[in-house]
Amino acid sequence: MTDIDVTVIGGGAAGLMAAVSAARCGARTRVIEHMDRIGKKILSTGNGKCNYTNAVQGLSCYRGENPAFVLPVFEQFGQEDTVRLFEELGIYPKIKNGYYYPASEQAVSVVEVFGMECDYLGVDLWTSCGLQSIQKTCTGYEIS
């Protein structure tokens, strides 16, 4: 089995962002996705257009007992960082009513670009792959 520095469980939006970020930092990275392809749920976001961020991200946009939980996250990686990352990947925005979409207005283009970036960075993409267990070992974790 190949030694991997980072294993990301799930090849959705968050998983792909995590994998790209880890690989850009030099980590040998693998994504394990149970669906037959990465980014499948991304295809339905924004009515198939992939609304990837919003101009307004105040606390009123979040529900739950503690909407302030998002503040430390946005301090580290906010809306401007998201737009910059997408532009670095070649995904330029089309803004409608404060919602950011790829200029193509096609969610599939976002999935394809993240797939190409993963390939470029050498990220192992395992699809149609069920996860049975994660065991802590003395040197890390064993995933089966």
Task: Locate the predicted segments by residue.
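Beta1/beta-strand and adjacent pyrophosphate-binding region of the FAD-binding site
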Residues: 1-14, 30
